[in-house]
């Protein structure tokens, strides 16, 4: 039962899907952390895989860059394939001195300059938030592993190359823990279709200081984020 953008059959996906932006990162996650992996889709080279993590069936699929792209994949996964939970795992930029490069952050909510949630919410502001139990499970998973995480609001930007850098000062004032491009869209889609969602990000660069991670450092901290995400799935099952 293929959709316009996913050529998988019903039952190919687990009820929980981890979603990085990069489809090659999805492949890395599947090959590194999952067992008994099967590739289930590849339309537009947006790869999806299903395997097991400590015996638990889990899927992983790329979502591309930006709210329009991730919203398409999240909608089809939830509406057409019966996915119940989505965990976005990606990178973000920091704007606060309290947030350091290589930190792992959990987005309990997502502000945005996109109008996408106003469009779906009849012109009104929609509070795009993560599922509380998923946030709690991720915090507990991180604590059990000794991985420090920061929890707060993300900012999902429409533009990567912004013409308004002064907005970063406003974000800092309001305590934004990371700037990325998808969480608000995924949270909106999950709310619209009765699913649950969470975003966990690794800070890859600091917008204010210009500090950036090397590719090796990104990989190491990304692995911490992935362990938190996968362990949180198991904790969520135990509730």
UniProtKB/Swiss-Prot annotation:
Record site feature (Important for catalytic activity), residues: 218
Q: Name one Pfam family in it.
A: PNP_UDP_1
> SUPFAM superfamilies from the entry?
Purine and uridine phosphorylases
Q: Tell me what reaction this enzyme catalyses.
A: a purine D-ribonucleoside + phosphate = a purine nucleobase + alpha-D-ribose 1-phosphate; a purine 2'-deoxy-D-ribonucleoside + phosphate = a purine nucleobase + 2-deoxy-alpha-D-ribose 1-phosphate
Q: Which GO terms describe its molecular function?
A: purine-nucleoside phosphorylase activity
| Gene Ontology terms describing biological process | purine nucleoside catabolic process
> Which residues does the Swiss-Prot or TrEMBL record annotate as the active site?
205
Report the superkingdom from the record.
Bacteria
Entry-linked InterPro entries: DeoD-type, Nucleoside_phosphorylase_CS, Nucleoside_phosphorylase_d, Nucleoside_phosphorylase_sf
**Coiled-coil stretches, from where to where?**
none
User: Which GO cellular component terms are attached?
Assistant: cytosol
Asked if the Swiss-Prot or TrEMBL record annotates the protein with the keyword Cytoplasm, the reply is: no
Q: Which PROSITE patterns match?
A: PNP_UDP_1
Q: What is its EC number?
A: 2.4.2.1
Binding of a purine D-ribonucleoside, residues: 5, 180-182, 204-205
The record's section on CDD domains has: PNP_EcPNPI-like
Signal peptide from the UniProt entry: none
Residues engaged in binding phosphate = 21, 25, 44, 88-91
**Which keywords are on file for this protein?**
Glycosyltransferase, Transferase
Function recorded in the entry: Catalyzes the reversible phosphorolytic breakdown of the N-glycosidic bond in the beta-(deoxy)ribonucleoside molecules, with the formation of the corresponding free purine bases and pentose-1-phosphate.
> How would you summarize the oligomeric state and partners of this protein?
Homohexamer; trimer of homodimers.
**The family this protein is said to belong to:** Belongs to the PNP/UDP phosphorylase family.
Q: Which HAMAP family match?
A: Pur_nucleosid_phosp (MF_01627)
Query: What is the official name of this protein in its record?
Result: Purine nucleoside phosphorylase DeoD-type 1
What's the encoding gene here? deoD1
